[in-house]
Each structure stands twice: as structure tokens, then as C-alpha cells.
Curated annotation (Swiss-Prot):
Residues 102-125, 379-405 form a coiled coil. This is Dynactin subunit 2. Belongs to the dynactin subunit 2 family. PANTHER family: DYNACTIN SUBUNIT (PTHR15346).
Length: 405
């Protein structure tokens, strides 16, 4: 409570608890704030500036599927399914760690494998398209095969070690080469052991060398899809060469539309076989006769064209002769027309002036009529006023007479 001696002073609140305001935090909070401030100002703490908008744009439309995840504890031997990890590790952008050649190679191999699978799905799901500008599944398969061939030609086995397994284009050939090299090494070891009298290397049961063969079904699918792509490419080349469209058909391929490929080949073969030496002589003789007839037709056509041109020239000459008589009088006609044009312009101006005078005369007549009516009204009012004045004067005279009496 406040001191009683300040109870009756103005501006002092009474019957209220005392309040002492300060900008400092309570003592407990002050100690915690100082410790947090020291921790934030320490050099051991890495301060990262995070842009919320950039982070939102980075992870926009990204999601993690948790449909088949199970992180619960297990009592059986089967392992619970958590988040699945990939075959290789992708480094985040801006992490400051440089990607090693081994990681780059594994990433490229896995990406090309995924690309091949996507191309196979597209080839099985989509239909054939006639658009040449669009990237077709056949072109995608060819580009994927070229990328794999580039990876194989890089000879990364000797550079990256045995972990970099390259079995992309010919896994069977790679396994066969590896088996042959191991057999030769084993033969060399056997011959060395027999010559030196030393113990042979440890073998499998019954002294048989054991090999492990790993099948790659995805590689078989890829080779099959590559063969299909090559077949489709060759068929596309045949279609462009033989072509079923009217714009692609030549003189040899005319009349083969709608037939099968074998029938088309037989028809083309028959047409080509018809062009032998004996038939060519006959065709040449016929062409010579046709050429002579064409020359005669051209001569007759030239004479007919000359006759037509002569008739047209004569018609033009007659027209010019008719116009010679009129050409002498044409300047006079032109001068007369120019003079008549000036007269027409003056007459038009005079007509405009007459219409203006007519309108002004009508306005004056209307104003005179209005003035005459006003004058009659003024005259009538003046007469009425004179009569009233005369009556007033007569009344005034009578009153004066009465006053004089």
C-alpha cells in the first residue's frame, strides 16, 4: 500500500498496489538470456541465413511417400521396412563437398538404367507417331545406347577399381572374358605348382573351381529393346524410301499403295527387270517418235500463236486509227471542260449566296412581324394610359373646384 502521507495528494492513485516498471527482464529470465546470448555470439556456432521463400520454392511439389513404411519394433527375423536408400548417394547442391569420380560414375550408370526402363515403358504404352519433329521412344533408346557406349569406351574399370562394374552393353561377353582370364590364371598356378612341387591353391569340393554367375534380366530387356529400336529404325527408313504417301511416291513406286511389303518388292523387281537392253532399245525408238511428234506440235503451236498475235496487233492498229481523228479535238474539249468547271464553281458560289440572302430575308421579315405586333401593343397601352390620365385629370379638376367653393 502507498504511504498515508501521499494519500491526499493530487495524481496519486489510492487503494491500488504499488507498481515499479522497468525495461529489464526478471532475474531468472535475465540469466537464461545471457547464456543464450553468449552461445549465439560464440565462434563455435554456425549461423545460417535461411530464406523461407527460396526454401519453399526448392521443396515445392516435393513429397515423401510413407505408404509402405513401418518403423515399429520387431520380434521376428524379418526386418521392418523404413525409408529405402538408393544404390548411390546424391550430394546436395551447395553442400561444399566435391563429388568423387566413383560417385559420378555410379550416378551416371543408375540414371542411364532408369532412362532405359522409362523408354521401355513408353514403347509399350504409346502408339507409333508420324511426327518427325518430336523425340520418339526409338530415338530415346538410340540415345541411351549411345550414352552407355560412351561409358563403356571410357575404360573406367581400370581407373575406378572392381567396384565400378560395367556390364551395360555385353554382360555375357564381359563374364566370358573374366572366366577365361581366371581359367588361365588357374592353369598357370597348376603348372607352377606341378613344376615346383608345391601345394596347389585351395580348391572347391572334388578339386573343381567354383564360379558364381549373376544374371541381369534388365540387361536382357535393354538389349531386346535396342534390337526392337534398330528394327523400327530400319522400318522407318524403308517407309521413307518406299513411302505410302502421294508426295513420297516416285514413278517406280506408283500403284503400290495399300499392298504389303513383299508384294511391293515383287512389283518393283518386275519393273526394274523390265528395263533390260532389249526393252531399252524399243523404249528409245518410241521416245524418238514421240519427240518428233512433240516437235511438230510445237511448230504448229508456234504458227497458231503467231496468227493470234497478228490478229491482235491488227485490232490494236484499227483502234489507234479511230482515235487519231478524236485526238485533234481532244485538247479543245479539255479546255472547254475546264472553263465549264469554273462556271460551275461560280454558279455554285452564287447559289450559296442566294440561299444565304434568302435565309437572312426571312429572318428580317420575322423580326419585322415581331416588331409590328409589339408596336400595336405599345400603341394600345399608350391609348389606355392616356385615357386613364385624362380621367385622373378630370377627377382632379372636380376636386379642385370643390375645394375652391
Amino acid at each position: 500500500m502507498a504511504d498515508p502521507k501521499y494519500a491526499n495528494l493530487p495524481g496519486i492513485a489510492s487503494n491500488e498496489p504499488d507498481v515499479y516498471e522497468t525495461s529489464d527482464l526478471p532475474e531468472d529470465d535475465q540469466a537464461q538470456f545471457e547464456s543464450e546470448l553468449e552461445e549465439l555470439c560464440s565462434d563455435s556456432v554456425e549461423r545460417i541465413v535461411v530464406n523461407p521463400n527460396a526454401a519453399y520454392d526448392k521443396f515445392k511439389d516435393k513429397h515423401v511417400s510413407a505408404k509402405s513404411l513401418d518403423f515399429s519394433d520387431r520380434i521376428s527375423k524379418n526386418r521392418r521396412v523404413g525409408y529405402e536408400s538408393g544404390d548411390y548417394e546424391l550430394l546436395a547442391e551447395g553442400c561444399g563437398v566435391k563429388e568423387t569420380p566413383q560417385q559420378k560414375y555410379q550416378r551416371l550408370v543408375n540414371e542411364i538404367h532408369e532412362l532405359c526402363q522409362d523408354v521401355e515403358k513408353i514403347q509399350t504404352s504409346t502408339k507409333e507417331s508420324g511426327a518427325e519433329e518430336r523425340l520418339t521412344p526409338v530415338a530415346l533408346a538410340q540415345q541411351a545406347a549411345q550414352l552407355k557406349q560412351q561409358l563403356v569406351s571410357a575404360h573406367l574399370d581400370s581407373l575406378l577399381g572392381p567396384d565400378a562394374h560395367i556390364n551395360l552393353t555385353d554382360p555375357d561377353g564381359a563374364l566370358a572374358k573374366r572366366l577365361l582370364t581366371q581359367l588361365e590364371v588357374a592353369r598357370g598356378v597348376r603348372s607352377g605348382a606341378g613344376a615346383d612341387g608345391k601345394t596347389a591353391a585351395p580348391k572347391g569340393p572334388d578339386g573343381v573351381i567354383l564360379y558364381e554367375l549373376h544374371s541381369r534380366p534388365e540387361q536382357e530387356k535393354f538389349t531386346e529393346s535396342a534390337k526392337v529400336a534398330e528394327l523400327e529404325r530400319r522400318l522407318a527408313e524403308l517407309e521413307t524410301a518406299v513411302g505410302s504417301g502421294s508426295d513420297k511416291r516416285g514413278p517406280l513406286s506408283s500403284g503400290v499403295q495399300g499392298s504389303s511389303l513383299t508384294e511391293t518388292l515383287e512389283l518393283l523387281q518386275a519393273r526394274v527387270s523390265a528395263l533390260d537392253a532389249a526393252t531399252l532399245d524399243q523404249v528409245e525408238a518410241r521416245l524418238q517418235s514421240v519427240l518428233g511428234k512433240m516437235n511438230e506440235i510445237a511448230k504448229h503451236k508456234a504458227t497458231m500463236e503467231d496468227a493470234e498475235t497478228q490478229s491482235k496487233v491488227s485490232q490494236l492498229y484499227d483502234v489507234v486509227q479511230k482515235w487519231d481523228a478524236m485526238a485533234t479535238s481532244l485538247p479543245q474539249v479539255v479546255r472547254r471542260l475546264t472553263a465549264v468547271r469554273e462556271l460551275h464553281e461560280q454558279a455554285m458560289q452564287f447559289g450559296q449566296l442566294l440561299t444565304h440572302l434568302d435565309t437572312t430575308q426571312q429572318m428580317i421579315n420575322n423580326s419585322l412581324k415581331d416588331n409590328s405586333t409589339l408596336l400595336t401593343q405599345v400603341q394600345q397601352t399608350m391609348k389606355e394610359n392616356l385615357l386613364a390620365v385624362e380621367e385622373n385629370f378630370s377627377a382632379l379638376d372636380q376636386r379642385m373646384k370643390k375645394l375652391n367653393k
